[in-house]
Amino acid sequence: MDKRLGIIGITIKDRYKSAPKVNRTLSEHGDIIVGRMGLPFRDKGVNVIGLIIEATTDEVGALTGQLGMLQGVKVKSLLV
């Protein structure tokens, strides 16, 4: 399979409960992550992480699937 460029958006509701699990999962898939930016939206009670990735569709599915199973975490991806 060919690798494709993509973006993954992650929102985290409970930072203290979910962030360690999110960071662990991202570290496990670090070989596909080209760039990462995280922003806290304290007034909204949400934290946002944006990832630039280069991966196969299977690799993207594995990462987003693991993240999506975490409580309080929502994930969306876009491949180009």
Positions of PLM-derived features:
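Long, contiguous binding/interaction regions
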Residues: 1-80
